[in-house]
Amino acid sequence: MDTTARFAVALRSAAARHGDADLCVFAGDIADQAEPEAYRLFDSLRRALLIPQCVTLGNHDDRNVYLTYAENFETDPNGYVQCRRDIKGHCVLVLDSSEPGHERGGFPAPKLAWVAEQLANARRSGLKVIVILHHNPAALQMPVDTYRLSAPSDLLAVLKQSGADILQVIAGHCHISSAGSWGGLPCATLAGNHHRVEPFLRGRTGRQQCYEGPAHYGVVVSNGSDCAVHFEAYVGEADPMDGTLFPRKVDQAFEEVG
């Protein structure tokens, strides 16, 4: 699979369909084996995307290598690749769940302290919070749970004890798109740019099938009270149906926002 070509398709899709977006987040696993040339290629490809961007890391990345060879990155005061964006009444927290050498990543005390500080600030400012990280914190009742975020209760405690209004938690890592909750917080996962896995739930044995598509990125739309996460398939969409079967689907009206 040519993931570079796929990434280029994703960027073109985002620019064409969502060019007015306020932020584009690249949520980790930027490279497969933390290759310097992969980080350079990633930066060269995303330069053409005019949407403001944030990047964080996943278990296939190496923070030291990334910080050495990448460009236009952001870190917190402790050197973790995580950032915050305040956008139209929302605080978007992009968290670095990676820990080099540990597939499950994690949130040691310095990371959690930064998260707690940002949440406290968001609460004081009356901002709604959207959290984005690489490792899925919620159990999907699939084998991937054995390498989901380590000690997820540590992060959950910081989020809930903050008193901040958390609209959504979004993760990748598991190669499947899902929606549910994590400790009472809305939580979604995205299949991402590489392969997608089939739902392989408890009780099943044998091989879990992997598929080349569809590849998904997420589109988050929020007005502060209603927050939707759309799974946008940019590779592997099924063939479109005859449009004459759905006459209402032309020049449709949207619900008025009060």
Give short role names for the model-derived ranges.
Residues 9-23, 105-186, 218-219, 247-258:
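His/acidic metal-ligating clusters that form di-metal
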Residues 28-29, 58-59, 134, 172-173:
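Active-site glycine-centered loops adjacent to acidic/histidine catalytic or metal-binding residues
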Residues 31-32, 62, 137, 176:
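Short active-site segment of divalent metal-dependent hydrolases/proteases
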Residues 35-125, 154-165, 183, 191, ...:
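Extended active-site neighborhood of metal-dependent phosphoesterases/phosphodiesterases
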Residues 158, 181-258:
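Binuclear metal-dependent phosphoesterase catalytic core
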